[in-house]
Amino acid sequence: MKTDNGGQQALLAEHELILQEPEWFRKAIENKPENRFVPFRESQLHYSFWAGPSADAQNIVLLHGDGAHAHWFDFIAPLLTPYYNVIALDMPGMGESGWLDGYSREIMAEAMIEMIRHANFSSKPAFIAHSFGGMVSLITAHHYADELAALMICDFHVKAPDVHHEWYSDIESWRPTRVYKTREDAEARFRLAPEQPCENHFIVEYIGSHSVREVQIGENGLRGPSEEAGWTWKFDPSIYPGFTVGYDLPEIYKSIPLPVAGMFGGASHDFDQISRRDVIAYMRDLRPDAPHYDISGARHHIMLDQPRAFASAVLAQMEFWRASGAFQK
């Protein structure tokens, strides 16, 4: 077992951890995507592309959460490509995308639409986004709804203003990410955020192996010359000070002129001031036209906990949208 990640896996009994990659997973990650890069704000963006059955097939855009990357979907996208073309995006400052001089939710949304445009789909795509990516997808749909067909947010909770909490309000300054001497040391410290146990330990290890990068002494990738060589995390720590999620998300969610859906982990976490069920009830009130449903057995990181159920739910929602004419607009 490579990961020693803050005790999150220790919450599970040894017999609950699945250590060996099952056949479906091995076959999925053997389906390698095409890596594509897009110039953006004196930097570049990266996304992964998996071809579907034809260029004329409908299209899916997948977006990761905070501090994550497109590789979170390496084993999800191939489950969708028998039916759809799929891209998985790296947000600016995360994964293989470059770092920017500054970040905001609007800049994130601009980056998303630039990659979607670069994919040059034959028809408007459905946007499926997880956690922090769910917020970014809402802002993207708010500004660029005419370039999207539908939107699904996955375990991102739109809260009423009186219980909304700005995620990064207590981060006044950033610190360079820690540098570990070896790749193995870095991977052993990988942990999910928010932290949770995950029975699919083979997936946690796979994600961890794609979450680190090598740095050399004097390299400027850490927002300043690194004083040591080794391995560190791929995300830019300067994203968070001053980053605003916004109190206007309920109005944005309510008014997006697209079919929407919400997928949630049935075992995901509650919040300090309100339960997850109460938040989902609030979201249903905002969008009574939209399905909001749980994936049984999944915590916050749905695609890690229940990957095939996650993919099946996406496929079912895509078929519902097709039948209701969402892709004909």
Per-range role (PLM):
Residues A28, F40-S43, S48-W50, A88-I128, ...:
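Active-site loop/oxyanion-hole signature of alpha/beta-hydrolase fold enzymes
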Residues H46-E96:
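Conserved HGGG/HGGXW glycine-rich cap/lid loop of the alpha/beta-hydrolase fold
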Residues L138-H142, A149-R183:
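Flexible "cap/lid" loop of the alpha/beta hydrolase fold
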Residues K181-G246:
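Conserved alpha/beta-hydrolase catalytic His-Asp/Glu region
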Residues I295-P307, A311:
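Catalytic histidine-centered segment of alpha/beta-hydrolase-like enzymes
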